[in-house]
Amino acid sequence: MSQRTALLIIDMQQGMSWPSLPQRNNPDAESAIFGLLQHWRFRKAPVVHVRHISRIPGSPFWPGQPGVDFQFALAPLPHEHVVDKSVPDAFVNTGLGQWLHQRDIGSVVVVGVSTNNSVEATVRTAGNLGFQTYVASDATFAFAKKDFAGTPRSADDVHNMSLANLHGEYATVLPAQALMRMA
């Protein structure tokens, strides 16, 4: 990472840890995210916390619902930037790109959930906007789901396919420890 690098933490909210969700992979993702967060804070590097706010009444991410709140261990400090989004891509209608450019940030490390949704959407846009983009493979996770043909896919399958979609085209995908050594 040759440029000033921000850590983007995507949708690490209370609702993402509810037991009613489908089976997920990377049970240690929160620990890896916490390690990266501590590393960024120690270096006094920029951290951005992205929060999903649903436009669907009754959603766990509807304003005022407990699912909207950040997970306690990963909650932002007062000086850390918070971005509220209502679509998967953290750059759409949020000012995130402008905020990064105003601070001369040319590189981002993206972590959080879910790999195939908000993480992938945000990473694609970051890469398309010219940011040097990294994804921490062990600091992201996905949920099991059916593919377009109706075949059940494990959370690992969904996660790994999403990372394959991103690596080499929109981002460089590496484990958290490797990214900490580079930062």
Where are each of the predicted segments found?
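Active-site-adjacent betaalpha module
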Residues: S2-A6, F34-Q38, F42-R43, R55, ...
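Conserved non-catalytic scaffold segment of RNase H-like nuclease domains
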Residues: H49-R55
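Short acidic, Gly/Ser-rich segments with clustered Asp/Glu that frequently serve as metal-coordination loops
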Residues: G15-P19
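N-terminal nucleotide-binding beta1-loop-alpha1 segment
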Residues: L7-M12
